[in-house]
Amino acid sequence: MTDPLNIPTAAYRAVLIDLDGTLLDTIPDLAAAANAMLAELEAPQLPLADIATFVGKGTENLVQRCLTDPRVGLPADPATVAAALSVFNRHYHAVNGQASQVYPGVLEGLAAFRAQGATLAVVTNKPTEFTLPLLRRSGLSNWFDVVVCGDTCERKKPDPLPLLHACEQLGCPPQQALAIGDSVNDALAARAAGITVLAVPYGYNEGRDIHDLDIDGIVFGIDDAADWAATRGKHRGALAATDNTNTIGK
């Protein structure tokens, strides 16, 4: 029989995790689709590292950034963007999940959060038509109780609505939730929602320094985030984010 005194208690009742750049490295597939789109539009190809800086605000923004890159120089009027987005979506459907990789520590971290008694949600700006197949192909689907996509709510991150919607679906007050992401969009959304937020340093963040974000800590991975949550900021594995950021051992 399990000793009730040894049943783990979650420091946070719900953990809301970003997808691209946090759970999965999806840049290889996104870049392949973006460059296939540009090729079909008879435009120059862009380096993978540059396309990575366009990720974070949804696929429409990614397409618009590709079109308006100085090396491409295509117009970004609504009709052109809509047509290019249709081309991108067709190519992305063909490659979605083929080269994407689960980051180290993700599975261990999800298991640790579960062991703590937390419920889990994905909160992403990626459309549902790409998110759900990607989660299945990567083997992550069964870990999550709720999936909030870029078209689930009226507004995307950095608006707080997707995070608040996830909390509502999980029956968890925002102040008892933890958000984990890799970008300014995650940080702004969590702050506006009143949710504790951690960031991983290996993601995309539109080319910006993760240390400049208003967050509660930087962790090396989802496994490190679970350690952070278990000790509420006293695990020595996290990095300092800013002078007023909670750091491990502080």
For each feature predicted by the language model, list its residue ranges:
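Active-site neighborhood of HAD-like aspartate-dependent phosphohydrolases
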Residues: 2-53
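Short, acidic loop-to-helix structural element flanking the phosphoryl-transfer center
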Residues: 10-13, 90-122, 128-132, 160
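Short helix-capping segments at alpha-helix termini
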Residues: 39-44, 71-76, 115-116, 139-143, ...
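A metal-dependent, Asp-based hydrolase signature
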Residues: 57-94, 104-107, 112
